[in-house]
Amino acid sequence: MNLHEYQGKQLFAEYGLPVSKGYAVDTPEEAAEACDKIGGSEWVVKAQVHAGGRGKAGGVKLVRSKEDAKAFAQQWLGKRLVTYQTDANGQPVTKILVESCTDIAKELYLGAVVDRSSRRIVFMASTEGGVDIEKIAHDTPEKILKATIDPLVGAQPFQGRELAFQLGLEGKQVAQFAKIFVGLAKLFQDHDLALLEVNPLVIKADGDLHCLDAKINIDANAMYRQPKLKTFHDPSQDDPREAHAAKFELNYVALEGNIGCMVNGAGLAMGTMDIVNLHGGKPANFLDVGGGATKERVTEAFKIILSDTNVAAVLVNIFGGIVRCDMIAEGIIGAVKEVGVKIPVVVRLEGNNAELGAKVLAESGLNIIAATSLTDAAQQVVKAAEGK
C-alpha cells in the first residue's frame, strides 16, 4: 500500500525527522488558509497522487500569494494528474499539500528497500538527489552508496556517519544525517515498510539537512498488524478493477495489452504472460485466481477481464492439483454463459482430471478453444486476438 507525501511526512515528524511545515487541504479556500497558518511570502503547493513525476506534469508549483495557491487548488482538485508513472488516464487529485518554502543549496538521495537476496533492509544514498534514482543506478551504479541493516541490532549511528562522510557531508551535517538514518530505519521496521525514499534529502542554505519529499510503500502482507496505517489508505488511487478483484481474493494487475489472462498460481501466471509475449501477443492483465478457483471466482475473474475494453481474446491456463480440472471446466462454462462472453476464449487444462475437463469443454457447445499445450494455447490466443 502506498502513502501520499503528506502522510509520509506525518510519520517522519513522529520520528523526529526534519520536514516542512505544511497542511493537506481539500478545497481552494483551505489552501489559502493554509498559507496564513504557515506564514511567510512563498509556499510550495503539491498535488497529492500515488505517482512520481508530478513536477514535470505541473503538479508542483511555487506560489507567492494566497490567490495563486487557491488557483492551483482550483486547477487540480477533482482533476486527474498524468505523469510518466501513470497510465493515460492519470490519477485523481483529492488533496493538495501546501508547504513552507525551503531554500535549497544541494539535493541528495536517501532510500531503503528490503533486499530479498540478503534478506536485510538495505539503505541507499547518493549525491544525485532529485532525479530518477533508477536511471542513476543503471547508468552510474558507482554513485549509489549502500548500508545493510543487521536485524539483530538494527541501524547503528556509525553506519549513518559512514554514509555521511561518503556523501561529502561535514560538521553538524554528519550528526544530522546519522539521526535521520537511524530514525528512518526504525520507521521502516516499526511499520513493516517495503520501500522508503527521501528524494530529495536537501542541504538547506543554512547547512541543515531537510526531508523535502517522502515516498512510502507498506508491505500489504503486514497490514493486519498496522491498524493505524490502514486508515491512511486512499481508495481513489486504486485501479477500480484491482480493488474489485481484491474483494474476491483475486490477484489482478491491469496491463496495456489485448489478451486477457486467467491463471491459477502466480508463477504460472507470469510464465503464461511470458509465453504470450514470446509468440507476439501482449497480455492485458496479470490475474491469479489462486488455488480455490470456484465457479464464482472464475465468473468474477471473467467480469473483471472483460471490463477492459481492449481485451480481444482470453487465455485461461489452469493446472489442476487439489482443484480438479473438470470442476474448473464447469466453472468456465458457467461463467461464459453467465457473463455472455463474445470474444474468443482459449483454455489449457493440465493435471488432475485434465482429460475429463477437456471433454466437458468440448461437449459444452460454446465457442471455447481447447489447447493441447501451453505453447499451443499461446499461439491460439494470439491468432484469436488478431482475428485470424
From Swiss-Prot:
Catalytically driven reaction(s): succinate + ATP + CoA = succinyl-CoA + ADP + phosphate; GTP + succinate + CoA = succinyl-CoA + GDP + phosphate
InterPro entries assigned to the protein according to its UniProt record, in alphabetical order: ATP-grasp, ATP-grasp_succ-CoA_synth-type, ATP_grasp_subdomain_1, Succ-CoA_synthase_bsu_CS, SUCC_ACL_C, Succ_CoA_ligase-like_bsu, Succinyl-CoA_synth-like
Binding site for ATP: 46, 53-55, 99, 102, 107
Oligomer status and interactors: Heterotetramer of two alpha and two beta subunits.
Positions annotated to bind substrate: 264, 321-323
Protein name per Swiss-Prot or TrEMBL: Succinate--CoA ligase [ADP-forming] subunit beta
Cofactors named for this entry: Mg(2+)
HAMAP family tied to this protein: Succ_CoA_beta
Enzyme Commission (EC) number: 6.2.1.5
GO biological process, one term: succinyl-CoA metabolic process
Keywords attached to this entry: ATP-binding, Ligase, Magnesium, Metal-binding, Nucleotide-binding, Tricarboxylic acid cycle
Any one GO molecular-function label of the UniProt entry: ATP binding
Pathway(s) served: Carbohydrate metabolism; tricarboxylic acid cycle; succinate from succinyl-CoA (ligase route): step 1/1
PROSITE patterns xrefs: ATP_GRASP, SUCCINYL_COA_LIG_3
Cellular component GO terms held in the UniProt record: cytosol; succinate-CoA ligase complex
Job of this protein: Succinyl-CoA synthetase functions in the citric acid cycle (TCA), coupling the hydrolysis of succinyl-CoA to the synthesis of either ATP or GTP and thus represents the only step of substrate-level phosphorylation in the TCA. The beta subunit provides nucleotide specificity of the enzyme and binds the substrate succinate, while the binding sites for coenzyme A and phosphate are found in the alpha subunit.
Enzyme kind, highest EC tier: ligase
Source taxon at top rank: Bacteria
Organism of derivation: Pseudomonas fluorescens (strain ATCC BAA-477 / NRRL B-23932 / Pf-5)
Family membership: Belongs to the succinate/malate CoA ligase beta subunit family.
UniProt remark on cofactor binding: Binds 1 Mg(2+) ion per subunit.
Binding residues for Mg(2+): 199, 213
ATP-grasp domain sequence ranges: 9-244
